[in-house]
UniProtKB/Swiss-Prot annotation:
Domain of life: Bacteria
InterPro entries the record matches: Chromosome_partition_MukF, MukF_C, MukF_C_sf, MukF_M, MukF_M_sp, MukF_WHTH, WH-like_DNA-bd_sf, WH_DNA-bd_sf
Native source organism of the sequence: Actinobacillus pleuropneumoniae serotype 5b (strain L20)
Molecular function GO labels: calcium ion binding
Family per similarity comment: Belongs to the MukF family.
Protein name: Chromosome partition protein MukF
Function statement: Involved in chromosome condensation, segregation and cell cycle progression. May participate in facilitating chromosome segregation by condensation DNA from both sides of a centrally located replisome during cell division. Not required for mini-F plasmid partitioning. Probably acts via its interaction with MukB and MukE. Overexpression results in anucleate cells. It has a calcium binding activity.
One Pfam family from the record: MukF_M
Subunit structure, as described in the record: Interacts, and probably forms a ternary complex, with MukE and MukB via its C-terminal region. The complex formation is stimulated by calcium or magnesium. It is required for an interaction between MukE and MukB.
Gene Ontology terms: biological process: cell division; chromosome condensation; chromosome segregation; DNA replication
Gene: mukF
Region of interest (Leucine-zipper), ranges: 209-237
Compartments where found: Cytoplasm, Nucleoid
GO terms under cellular component: cytoplasm; nucleoid
Keywords recorded for this protein, A-Z: Calcium, Cell cycle, Cell division, Chromosome partition, Cytoplasm, DNA condensation
Length: 443
């Protein structure tokens, strides 16, 4: 029996050769085709006049900053080019006195549909598509259980599965491939942001990572919820084919649909796993950049403090200018005088390394019981508790040390599930932290 599922490679090659396709679309030509497609969708009869096409080309020409003087000539060249490449069909008659009517071809519809509709991939659209698939497969399985001759199977089982279910599966698969491209674009945007000014780009990177992770998780949940039911219905139909050698074409179609469904579902999970790995890589890069760029962070905080200096409600009152000059003499006398007595502890010098070692030892002693007793570490609560014991000038170093010591002990199980925690305040100066509870400790 002739394979009714798809054409063979030689058939497709001969078909292409007979039609002599030669496709080449520059950016302005593609924009012109998309404009024609969108305008055509708004027309009731689907027919376009040459004046309509010239008006559409005028919009494209303005966007691409092309000369107005040669507009008509370039519009005619663009129209003839689309007709030659079979994106448009031209119809003319001796009764229309040279006026032509244009209709967009299936090839033009397909190319425009790829660039316009397939980018609208959302959970709502996916849910509607899966709902339609479920209804079609349900009707097909009910018809299969009724039984009948080959013609009955062809009309009531094979036709809806091939021309409805299979096409929707192909549409979902194509949309997933568009999301692959979208992920690559997001990665390029994140790389560009981090290469310019990573400190200012952290918030934008977090937003892009969160949005993409949430979209992938939501779409995968929708696929998982419907996948098992669809596979069960396909198995129902397949069980009705036992002993029916005349229905091999239906059995082959069922196998193809099962493979497509498995590929769609597995793609979603694989995309999530890959994105989680990329997410961790970006966060690791940011943490490393912070550790390597302490001087820059300090410099930025210093510049910020200078910029905010005049916002403080401080007023200096000057009076008796001569007395102020006299103070200089007193200062000179004090500088020349010999210092006696003990220096207050607040003014004693402590090296930064000694201070950090003290804080590290204290934090290790504080966090060790959590690991020993298997208790989860809530970084937000620990940071709030410890920062309250230190002056504000040490909050940055203390917070960094606490996070470093906690990460060495273990990790949060929610991180592997792409679950992002809420921001928590850790002091009364507006500092916040975003961290899941650490509940898996290293051995």
């Amino acid at each position: 029996m002739q394979n009714e599922l798809a054409q063979t490679i030689p058939e497709l090659i001969n078909w292409t050769k007979e039609r002599e396709f030669s496709l080449s679309l520059s950016s302005d030509r593609l924009a012109f085709l998309l404009a024609i497609s969108i305008y055509n969708n708004e027309q009731t009869d689907g027919e376009l006049l040459e004046s309509d096409l010239i008006d559409l080309f005028r919009y494209v020409s303005e966007v691409f900053d092309q000369s107005e003087a040669t507009l008509t000539q370039r519009a005619n060249n663009a129209i003839n080019d689309l007709v030659k490449q079979r994106f448009l069909n031209r119809f003319s008659s001796e009764f229309t006195e040279g006026l032509a009517i244009y209709r967009i071809t299936p090839l033009g519809v397909g190319v425009a549909d790829y660039y316009v509709r397939q980018r609208e991939f959302s959970t709502l659209r996916l849910s509607i598509q899966l709902s339609i698939v479920a209804d079609e497969i349900q009707r097909a399985s009910s018809a299969a259980e009724e039984g009948g001759d080959e013609r009955f199977w062809r009309n009531n089982v094979f036709a809806p599965l091939k021309y409805s279910v299979a096409e929707i599966f192909d549409s979902i698969d194509l949309s997933q491939r568009m999301m692959d491209e979208n992920q690559h674009q997001i990665r390029e945007r994140i790389a560009e942001l981090l290469s310019q000014n990573w400190h200012e780009a952290i918030l934008s990177c977090e937003q892009l990572l969160d949005e993409t992770s949430g979209n992938l998780r939501e779409l995968q949940d929708t696929l998982n919820a419907a996948g098992d039911k669809l596979q069960a219905q396909l198995l129902r139909i397949q069980s009705c084919l036992i002993g029916r050698d005349d229905l091999d074409f239906v059995d082959q179609l069922i196998v193809n649909l099962q493979n497509k469904l498995d590929r769609i579902i597995s793609w979603g999970q694989q995309a999530i796993d890959l994105w989680i790995g990329y997410d961790r890589h970006v966060h690791k890069f940011i943490r490393t950049a912070i550790d390597m760029d302490k001087n820059r962070v300090f410099g930025q905080r210093l510049r910020q403090s200078i910029q905010d200096y005049f916002k403080c409600a401080l007023v200096t009152l000057y009076c008796e200018a001569e007395s102020l000059l006299d103070l200089r003499d007193d200062e000179t006398m004090l500088n020349e005088a010999e210092a006696v007595g003990e220096l207050p502890s607040e003014l004693e010098y402590e090296s930064l390394s000694d201070v950090q070692e003290q804080i590290i030892s204290v934090m290790q002693a504080h966090l060790a019981p959590f690991r020993a007793e298997g208790k989860p570490i809530d970084l937000g609560a620990v940071l709030r508790e410890q920062l309250a014991l230190y002056p504000q000038s040490r909050h940055f170093d203390v917070a960094r040390i606490i996070v470093d010591q906690a990460v060495k002990l273990g990790m949060a199980s929610l991180d592997s599930q792409a679950v992002y925690p809420e921001w928590q305040a850790i002091n009364d100066k507006g500092a916040e932290v975003q961290a899941n509870v650490i509940d898996q400790y290293n051995k």
